[in-house]
Amino acid sequence: SISAFLVEADYSLMTGSILIASSVIFCASIYPLRVREFVLLGQIPAIFGIIRSYEILADTKGYGTEPLILLLLTLGLAHWWSLQKNRFITESEPDREQANGISFVFEILYSGAIISQVLIWLIATHQYSADWLWIGSVTTVAITAYSAMTRAKFIGSFSQIFLALACVCQINICIYNNEGTAIMAMIPIATMLGTSLIIPYITKLSGTVSESMSRTFGLIQRGYRLASTGLLMLWIYRFVPGDSQFWVSVVLSFACVIAGKWRPAAEWGWASLAFSLSGLIYLCAGGSNPIPIPDQWITFVCILIGIVFFFSSLLVSNKETLTSFFTYVCAGYILIARELLERDALLPSLAAILLLLTVQQISRR
């Protein structure tokens, strides 16, 4: 009857807040009344309020107290089901496994609701454009840090949608040459890399972290590193001059080798391999903006870079980054074989072969 009365009233954001506040009151009633049915059925007003709030938020321009109250009430319900479920089990004395499942479902529901409300509100306030490069990045960082400190893993997981939208915006800029500068297009990449490095420190500050929470943040870190690799390759293609694309790819590949020593992870090896392959494409494909390397020296450059990768991997004790060494050396082998078969081998080809023999002798000793 409360839900029917409120839904039929003149609807506004404040009416939605009253609906959700009704559910908050029913949740609090478990402590003095200990009636489990009030808590469960009392979520109906909040569900109505959340559904109806989407339409109102989509037409809301700017910031104000009414959207803030609505968001805070939804956030409060998400935290209640996440943090107070043990009290809910103790007071109601139901089946423990069943109560955990109920708390789990409502925590996911309200976590998704708060993220979707913020998303609709931001899109209504800021139309989807190049501005979302920084809006999505900043929002994701703020919510991820908050979820790590409050251990609200579902809120942190769902908040990645903001960064995903920023990444989609960057992809459109890089592929279709839409509006946007090189610095703005770098914001989502820097956000992902920075967040992947900061997450371990945030979890340490928050104290003991559950295994599921640690696994969730581990997946986020791994996804960030791999996604940032692909976005960096697009950024190089779009904003770096053609005669520098190869060298930038090589430098980033070496940076992945160093990062693998500083913070060991298998994905650094894959990132190094990806930049190596893109560098080879820029080196061998040429195009309208060829790199300033004579064609006869390309084979020698491939072998030389591969050897540098080999010794760098040994110095940092990172076996995963040996894939970049094999990539450049194999490319050098193929180029040498082609030059010999076509009888086009010159002095640089001989220098590359002698360089390989020299490294082989050094390695034996």
Q: Residue ranges of each PLM-predicted region?
A:
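Alpha-helical transmembrane segments of multi-pass membrane proteins
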Residues: 1-365
